[in-house]
Amino acid sequence: MKKLFFILLASIFFTSCGHKEGAHNHDHHGHHHDHEHNAKLHLTGYNDIFEVYAEADPFVTGQESTILTHITWLNNFKPLSSGKVTAILNVGGKQYTYKVDLPIQAGIYRIAITPKESGTATLTYQIETRDTTSTIEIKGIDIYTNEHEAHEMAEAITPKSINVINFTKEQSWDVDFATEQAK
């Protein structure tokens, strides 16, 4: 009786887990993608004064990438409300610089950079306030020559879960919430 039960259970399991041909009509390996690429790069950097969290379009040579840069004071975990920010993308010995004098809202600076070289880059932020000048580097950013490849890579490294609860940087500024670099 136990043997019959086990065989019945195993057959139900294997038939329910089967993949039926034609049930998936999205040709992911072909070149006919009708979906939009919305994945963003999530970049984080720290120093003793600031945390920088940036949401960036994947970087592609010859195309403008928009970077929404969130800057947080580490002493109180509140947004940088004023100050000048310079972003420098260094790739292959070439530097691409973008300066912003004011945030679009407290703590958020919109930056646009168009790299002309591919390779691995470093994004350096120079943050100038009335009282201090500070630098933060974020290394290991890939610049692609192909838009499709750049977006596919960004999608591949974006965590996916059906049980996601988003907690934005803006929300963290409104409550007593702090982050800390792992040591």
Mark where each language-model region is.
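Intrinsically disordered, low-complexity terminal tails/loops enriched in metal-binding residues
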Residues: M1-K183
